[in-house]
Amino acid sequence: MSVRKLRTLPVEYLWDGLVLNDDIFNHTGAVLLLPKGETVTRNKLDKLMGFYGDNKNVMVYEETYVEIMTNEHVPPEVRQKLTENHVGYAHLHQNIGNLFERRDYDSWLSGEKLAPLIREVAGKLKDFDPVTILSCINFPRPMDEGLQRHSLNVALLNGMQAEWLDLPPDDVHTLVLAGLLHDIGKTMIPEEIVNAPRRLTDEELSVMRNHPVYSDDLLKGKFDDNVRLAARHHHEKLNGGGYPDGIAGEQLGICARITAISDIYDAMVSARSYKGARLPLDVFDMLYQEEFDGLDRQFVMNFLKNMRARYTNQQVVMSNGRRGEILYIPLNDADHPIIRQDGDIRQTDEEWYCKEILTAN
């Protein structure tokens, strides 16, 4: 018989009128505070808040945690912060930021010195369900939160793709490393261009397009060629229409092809000053419809197959403000999934659509 897992929950996310589907325990999990079936009242909340002084947490079972944290009483940014702390995403982001802010590349930019960080990132792929990790990646956030966050996201997405392709552990680590360092050359570009709060001018875009070459220069002689060339070639296209070298077909390595998909996906689900963040479902449709030409179709289809499977059965907020559940995501029409809402099952359209995908892991 499996042991049910307890999770820490801040008392402030309980609310007056909540009917408990399971027991609530104290912050150590040893003392039953509120039994299953009991209704939370304002008086009980006040007692819980004062029960253990500065410790304002209780312990609940995993199922109760998810139910509470996906409720509309809990603001999305709160759910996000708790999820990122639980996964260790916030810790990874901080560590990567500390490295990227240093310009003494010789002191840290090597496979040996980055190995512990890469193992930690790769370990998240084993320890957490992809949907939990994707909830960290997909949460709408401004691009000026940093190159570091984008690099972490691409590393995680690369690792997921490697796992879904059943690649051996060494290749998973190589792809995670390639994702982490794919844009390292942007540290050589003026910050006012990298973090410009608008679309770049033609002149600025020309400068920005040098970043793959700068990445190559920084990584040359320090890393496996697969890592270096993924950084140089992740903006190349199979049809020869990419940059900086205009290579095509078999000249484009597998590591670069996979990194290109991860890079595009993360860019599209992130907000910029001149565009909003796209829902994952929208990006799935764009990838299937080949709006990003020159990608490896085999890898794109594998990415979509696995992403669609992970988002099926997830909770969503619909345009009418009510909750629903994704029952099916059509491959050729991913931005119009089949939704169940209050017993009604139908496909979304232009007037009834998904506004938010909910996760609380």
Regions picked out by a protein language model, each given a short descriptive name:
Residues M1-L109, L114-A115, A277-N361:
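Terminal helices and disordered tails flanking the catalytic cores of nucleotide-processing hydrolases
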Residues V154, L177, L181-M188, L205-M301, ...:
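Alpha-helical scaffolding flanking metal-ion-dependent phosphate/phosphodiester catalytic sites
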Residues P142, N195-E204, A231-R232, C255, ...:
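Short alpha-helical linear motifs
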